[in-house]
């Protein structure tokens, strides 16, 4: 290969710092000063200007002054659309729900299983069987069966809590000792009729002495009044009773009422009393 092919292009021009100097045998020594080339296109010998090269046009900016940049337009896929899509809960495929938003569930075209798109109706809930069958049942249901003939699985849902768990309320009432069996029980009803049935012996007793005494007095008083009325009726209609047999019936009715009131008074007088021992507030 000739020496001229290894020499750099434009070997007769320098850059003022010694770079790009000629590498031929006629190059000056390192210690000598290098001539400086005149600027391109400036005054100088005509032989220094390259021949046959047109002049470069004036440089223009990439963006024309006073013109706004083009508007931003994101790239969109031609296959993408605005149709609402959901993911299948079984095979994770996309399901087009356009025109089906009024339904509660939609069917997947890949696995043919149902996927809910709305909440269950009031009082209902969705349950998915291990065979991927979507079931709907009551909120309070604890056991349901899969209707598919090849499954027929019984699903235990467990207890259902209608609301958030809250601690049990503290008992409010009166702790009393039964007048019959002497066992303690809690009584929560407070009224003028303070009669309590013991949960142990199932017998009725009174909470305190006030209520049975009041009832006993009223029954005895009413019984005495009825007895006096019966006695007066007997004395006043004694002579007429021989002619009118219905008078005997009136005597009997008054006497029975008097005996019933007196008997009820005796019942209240013999009523067992349960005494309160502790109260909760």
Swiss-Prot record:
Stated name of the protein: Type 1 phosphatidylinositol 4,5-bisphosphate 4-phosphatase
Reaction catalyzed: a 1,2-diacyl-sn-glycero-3-phospho-(1D-myo-inositol-4,5-bisphosphate) + H2O = a 1,2-diacyl-sn-glycero-3-phospho-(1D-myo-inositol-5-phosphate) + phosphate
Compositionally biased tracts (Gly residues): 14-23
Alphabetical GO biological process terms: phosphatidylinositol dephosphorylation
GO MF entry, a single one: phosphatidylinositol-4,5-bisphosphate 4-phosphatase activity
Lipid metabolism listed as a keyword: yes
Subcellular location, record wording: Late endosome membrane; Lysosome membrane
Membrane topology category: Multi-pass membrane protein
Chain positions of motif CX5R motif: 137-143
Cited Pfam families: Tmemb_55A
Membrane-spanning intervals of the chain: 216-236, 251-271
Biased composition (Low complexity): 24-35
GO cellular component terms attached to this protein's record: late endosome membrane; lysosomal membrane; phagocytic vesicle membrane; plasma membrane
Source superkingdom: Eukaryota
EC number: 3.1.3.78
Taxonomic source organism: Xenopus laevis (African clawed frog)
Its job: Catalyzes the hydrolysis of phosphatidylinositol-4,5-bisphosphate (PtdIns-4,5-P2) to phosphatidylinositol-4-phosphate (PtdIns-4-P).
Active-site residues annotated for this sequence: 137
Annotated region (Disordered), positions in chain: 1-80
